[in-house]
Design a protein with these regions (language model features):
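Positively charged n-region of N-terminal signal peptides that target proteins for export
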Residues: 1-6
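Bacterial N-terminal signal peptides
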Residues: 7-17
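Boundary at the C-terminal end of the N-terminal hydrophobic targeting segment
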Residues: 22-26
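Basic- and aromatic-lined ligand-binding clefts that recognize polyanionic substrates
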Residues: 28-46, 131-185, 198
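Structured C-terminal subdomain patch of bacterial secreted/periplasmic proteins
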Residues: 30, 93, 113-129, 219-272
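A short, structured surface patch at a secondary-structure boundary
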Residues: 30-90, 187-190, 200-204
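Extracytoplasmic/secreted envelope proteins and their assembly/folding machinery
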Residues: 36, 40-43, 74, 78, ...
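Glycine/small-residue-rich loop that forms an oxyanion/phosphate-binding "nest" at active or ligand-binding sites
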Residues: 91-108, 113
Length: 272
């Protein structure tokens, strides 16, 4: 057997091995636990739903329940033998350390402060899982929301962004994703408290009417499917237009925001 023939066999073996490894990286995925429905939605958008082996108690998927972001179920997580656990940065490092198997990797996503974090989260997951075939989807989402947000034309109308009229509502302020989104859409969000302001008895602002009187917005955006009776009880000193939009399209950091932007574009005549 000639040296040239043996050398050719070695090259063939190395090449085939490399191709097999590359194929595994592109078509196989690790065992993933999703600790929030919005993370599950992101994985589904990236074509990775079949990689999920466990989900939080709030998820719709029929899979083993692994607790929540703040209180993960360490025992169940351990039995599922995950390669990767994806959670939110709301989960403390101490909690993560106590509930993560030694063989698993944890990804703590930042999702609630800026719109750009949504696409950064997708890129982070792709890098950690080698799921490179989903890269075009990240690009598509990035281009879509940036294009749509420019079509809303908020005309610098002063607005307040409220989670609801009922229960314990909160207002979105600087360093929150919705503040960032509506600012990029051309509105002037007038809330000044960072992240969110809880409106309830005993707080600085105890009811919605007081919030409106303080900031005197042109528009009040309520993220509920329909206006509740509590909304009709708002009686500010200066009249304000109240607009209601489906919270499912805005409140969670996922790709549903594209549908939300479409609705804003369809309604832009209301704030000309």
């Amino acid at each position: 057997m000639s040296f040239r023939y043996i050398f050719s066999l070695i090259l063939l073996y190395i090449s085939s091995t490399f191709i097999s490894i590359s194929h595994a990286n592109s078509s196989e995925c690790p065992r993933i636990i999703s600790q929030s429905p919005y993370i599950t939605e992101m994985l589904t958008y990236l074509g990775m739903q079949h990689c999920i082996v466990g989900v939080s108690r709030y998820d719709k998927l029929d899979l083993p329940r692994t607790g929540g972001i703040l209180d993960p179920d360490a025992e169940t997580i351990d039995t599922l033998m995950p390669d990767i656990i994806i959670t939110s940065d709301w989960a403390t490092k101490e909690t993560v350390k106590l509930t993560t198997p030694k063989t698993a990797k944890v990804i703590r996503l930042k999702s609630f402060y800026k719109m750009i974090q949504l696409e950064e989260n997708m890129a982070t997951v792709i890098k950690a899982t080698h799921w490179v075939q989903a890269t075009p989807r990240v690009t598509a989402f990035k281009q879509a929301w940036r294009k749509k947000v420019k079509q809303v034309h908020g005309n610098q109308k002063k607005v307040l962004l409220l989670s609801s009229c009922s229960g314990t509502p909160y207002s979105f302020g600087p360093d929150s994703r919705l503040y960032d989104l509506f600012t990029q859409a051309g509105f002037k969000v007038v809330e000044t408290k960072e992240k969110i302001r809880h409106i309830r008895p005993g707080n600085e602002i105890e009811h919605i009417t007081a919030l409106i009187d303080l900031y005197q917005p042109d528009l009040l955006f309520i993220f509920e499917q329909r206006l509740r009776k509590q909304c009709q009880m708002i009686t500010p000193k200066v009249p304000v237009s109240i607009l209601s939009f489906d919270g499912k399209l805005f409140l969670q950091p996922n790709t549903e925001i594209l549908k939300g932007l479409d609705i804003l574009i369809q309604n832009k005549e209301r704030w000309k």
